[in-house]
Amino acid sequence: MSTPTLPDMVAPSPRVRVKDRCRRMMGDLRLSVIDQCNLRCRYCMPEEHYTWLPRQDLLSVKEISAIVDVFLSVGVSKVRITGGEPLIRPDLPEIVRTLSAKVGEDSGLRDLAITTNGVLLADRVDGLKAAGMKRITVSLDTLQPERFKAISQRNSHDKVIAGIKAVAAAGFTDTKIDTTVMRGANHDELADLIEFARTVNAEVRFIEYMDVGGATHWAWEKVFTKANMLESLEKRYGRIEPLPKHDTAPANRYALPDGTTFGIIASTTEPFCATCDRSRLTADGLWLHCLYAISGINLREPLRAGATHDDLVETVTTGWRRRADRGAEQRLAQRERGVFLPLSTLKADPHLEMHTRGG
């Protein structure tokens, strides 16, 4: 019997909704397309040199399409392209075109978004729009060029700002700006970032500093908590109102007195494990149930060995039904909480790195 080709193995199967052991539905897939990045942010990739995934192991566009079809069959309705830095990947427009063609009621895919550091965005945004990208999130930790250089170890602040402005000019809506907030580094810029976001038709989301793989300099005293953020912003703006939460998105959203909105993702002090519907696929096809997961399920190997669409649906369904991960809650419960994984462990297995599994 001949090995099935990829077009043979993506035959549609009925959509099912799968629950894990904590009764959490699968809904959101974080799809890393590359592990490399052109920044060296101190909270994610502080080292200058890394061990990259073997290039021959990276999923092709057809393989990405086939695996995404599997996840759509078991209830995923949102796909977010991540990295590393996804804009580094040369065939990203083809990936976006392939995935955007799936958006619609028939497949169940309702949302296709991308998270980028913005360095290459100004030159790529029109191509992303033409390829069918729906939403863009840009990481921006500071409005001050010197601070940007200190945090990212690169001198690219002007390029990121230009990229964000290009997103607005291209007509994208529901744009987000993600800011990792660190005490002593940028915690005094929250209001300034909200004001900047207003000018580019975006909503800023403040993220507590997390102790995930790669955060080898993490310490509790550097965490500027959700409570700290709200207290700081109320001193500037007055009473801040929480907004109703209607889905499993990680951000708690708030409104200023004038109606301007922003979000806070408090994964460190208030984990959302109880409602987490997301999983992650690395660029080489390792499926991870949690950002803190130590191991995952390799989907690339069976795919390349000739597994059918339904074979992979069974693998993913079984894997999700066994899922009991509550990594952030377990970290919060630790009495002596320090760095999650030492540098030596990270160097031995690049799959443990934050930049490999996507934020």
UniProtKB/Swiss-Prot annotation:
GO MF entries: 4 iron, 4 sulfur cluster binding; cyclic pyranopterin monophosphate synthase activity; GTP 3',8'-cyclase activity; GTP binding; metal ion binding; S-adenosyl-L-methionine binding
Limits of the Radical SAM core domain: 21-241
InterPro entries: Aldolase_TIM, Elp3/MiaA/NifB-like_rSAM, MoaA, MoaA_NifB_PqqE_Fe-S-bd_CS, MoaA_twitch, MoCo_biosynth_MoaA/MoaC, rSAM
Cofactor needs: [4Fe-4S] cluster
Residues involved in [4Fe-4S] cluster 1 binding: C37, C41, C44
Cofactor binding summary note: Binds 2 [4Fe-4S] clusters. Binds 1 [4Fe-4S] cluster coordinated with 3 cysteines and an exchangeable S-adenosyl-L-methionine and 1 [4Fe-4S] cluster coordinated with 3 cysteines and the GTP-derived substrate.
EC number(s) recorded for this UniProt protein: 4.1.99.22
Family, per entry: Belongs to the radical SAM superfamily. MoaA family.
Protein name: GTP 3',8-cyclase 1
Organism: Mycobacterium bovis (strain ATCC BAA-935 / AF2122/97)
Lineage: Bacteria, Bacillati, Actinomycetota, Actinomycetes, Mycobacteriales
